[in-house]
Swiss-Prot record:
Homology family: Belongs to the UPF0235 family.
Signal peptide location: none
HAMAP family the UniProt entry points to: UPF0235
Organism from which the protein derives: Rhodopseudomonas palustris (strain TIE-1)
Top-level taxonomic group: Bacteria
InterPro entries per UniProt: DUF167, YggU-like_sf
Protein name per its UniProtKB record: UPF0235 protein Rpal_0418
């Protein structure tokens, strides 16, 4: 399966599909959308109101890959379930951390 992130000199940009009010804060592995694009499935307890779910997603990803919260920001999709999230840091280390996270859950 293809990776749901792109590498850059600053870090990685991750394609995610968010489930707000998902019962828990967790990364649920990879999913392939109907158009064939892979995304990282993320669920958060926060509601999709006033940017709460977006903040929860960036905080969850920061903790999961081991970077400060200030290194994770929303690139696009502020009002959509599908988002692009930038994570600043060493691209190789971030890619390895993301691979480990999604490998722990089966792909759909």
């Amino acid at each position: 399966m293809a990776e749901a992130w792109r590498y850059s000199a600053q870090g990685v940009a991750v394609a995610v599909r968010v489930t707000p009010r998902g019962g828990r804060d967790d990364i649920d592995g990879l999913e392939t959308l109907s158009d064939g694009r892979p995304v990282v499935k993320v669920r958060v307890r926060a509601i999709a109101d006033g940017g709460e779910a977006n903040r929860a997603v960036t905080e969850l990803l920061a903790k999961a890959v081991g970077v400060p919260k200030r290194n994770v920001r929303l690139l696009s999709g502020a009002t959509s379930r599908q988002k692009q999230i930038a994570i600043d840091g060493d691209p190789k280390q971030l890619g390895e951390a993301l691979r480990r996270l999604v490998a722990a859950k089966p792909a759909e």
